Amino acid sequence: MTIPLTRCQFIIPFAAICDAIGAPTEALLTKFRLPASLEEKPEHYIPILLAVRFAEAAQRSQGITDIGFQAARQLQFFHLSEKLRAIIRFSPTLFIALQQLCKWASLEDTTVSVWLERNDHHVRICSKVAGTARMPHLEHSQWLQNVYTMQIVRQFTGPHWVPATMAFEARYEPSLETRSFWQNTRFISDQNSSWIDIPVSFLDLPNPASETPAPSHDDGVGPSGHEIVSAVKLMLPSYLDERIPTIAEIAEMAGISIRSFQRKLSSAGVSYSDLLDGARFENATKLLRDTDAKIIDVAFSSGYSDPAHFTRAFRRFFGVTPREFRGKWKPQ
C-alpha cells in the first residue's frame, strides 16, 4: 500500500502557530517523527498521517481553536510547488488551470485526486486523499486542500473571492469564531470528498498573469522568457486553423536562436508544446461549450488534421472525449 505523503511546506504553518504561542514545537514534531527543521525542507515529503496527528496533538495540548483553519489562513499561492505554480500561471483560462490542477495535484500530496463536478450553475472542485478513509481529524488537512484550491481560483478572480460553499469529507463543524471569518460561505461536512464550488461562468475567466508577466531573471539581451510566453500565447490562436509555426519559425520571429528560445521558455517553466496544447484546448473547449460546431470542425479549428488524433489528445488531457465534455459542460 502506498504511503500518503504531503510536502513539508504544508506542515510549516502548524509549527509556526505553535512557535507563536510558545509551545514546545520541536518536542511535538519529534514525538510524531517529523523533521524539526521543516523550513529548510519545504519541498521534501512527510507522511500525511503523522502530520495530521501532530496537528491534532498541538491543537488539543495547546488549546488552539481550529488549527487547520489557522494554518490555512497563512497559505498563499506562492506556497504551492514551483512546477504547479508555473502550470497555473501559464494556463490561459481558469478552466484550463483547473484541468491542469486535476492532472498535477499529486505534486502537493502524493495520493490526492482532484476532479470537477457540475452541479446546476456551479462547478465543484473536489479533492480526496487515497489511503486516508478511516483517518481521524482529517479536517486539518482538508482545510489546506480547500484553501489552496481557493488560492488558485483567486489567481483569476482577484484576491478577495470566497466560495459560496466549502465542504469537508471529515465529520467536522467549524467553530463560531472560524465561521465569523467566512460570513458568505456555507460549511457542510461528512461528504464523499472535500470541495469548494465556483459559478460555471468563472470557467472562461482569462488569466491576468498573461497580461502582466512576472519579472524575468534571464541573462543576456532580447525578450525575456515571460515576454516570449505572452507573445506566443497571443499569437498561436491565429494560426490554429492554418499552418502552425514550427519552433524554429517562432524563434526566428523572436529574433533569437532555437536554443535561446527553448532556454527562455524553460526559465518560464513551460515548453513550446505546452503553449501549443494550451492554445488548442482553450479553443476547443470554448467551441464545445459555446457553439454547436461539429466535433470534426472543432478538431480542424484547433489545429488537428486528424479528428481521431484530436479526440485521443483531448481525452488524454481532460479524461473525457470531446462529445462527453460537451454533454457535461455546455450550458443547458
Question: Over which residues does each language-model region extend?
Answer:
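DNA-contacting interfaces and partner/effector-binding or oligomerization modules
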Residues: S113-F202
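Short, contiguous, pocket-lining structural segments
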Residues: T6, A20, H137, S141, ...
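Extended mid-to-C-terminal alpha-helical interaction segments
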Residues: Y172-Q332
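N-terminal low-complexity or simple alpha-helical regulatory segments
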Residues: M1-R124
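Internal, well-ordered alpha-helical segments in soluble enzyme and binding-protein domains
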Residues: A97, Q145-Y148, I228
